[in-house]
């Protein structure tokens, strides 16, 4: 009787799906209210003027304007600001 021995099983072969984090709109770019600027885990970037923060720490524009990245305070925090266009 011709038989084949059972093949071994691998304990590898799985990986988590990428979360697509990072900066979505860069300094100098024009954004509309509601546009996502940064997707992040924790507050790598902090919200400044005209920028809101979601429960997953996503930063988004509250007003139409130009994105600006600044470093503020004694802690040298990276802050995202929206400079509204002159009306």
Curated annotation (Swiss-Prot):
Keywords: Ribonucleoprotein, Ribosomal protein
Gene Ontology molecular function terms on file: structural constituent of ribosome
Biological process, per Gene Ontology: translation
The keyword Transport appears for this protein: no
Highest taxon listed in the record's lineage: Bacteria
Keyword Cell cycle: no
Gene3D superfamilies registered for this protein in UniProt: 2.40.50.100
Disulfide bonds: none
InterPro entries per record: Ribosomal_bL27, Ribosomal_bL27_CS
Family: Belongs to the bacterial ribosomal protein bL27 family.
Identification of the protein by name: Large ribosomal subunit protein bL27
UniProt source species: Aromatoleum aromaticum (strain DSM 19018 / LMG 30748 / EbN1)
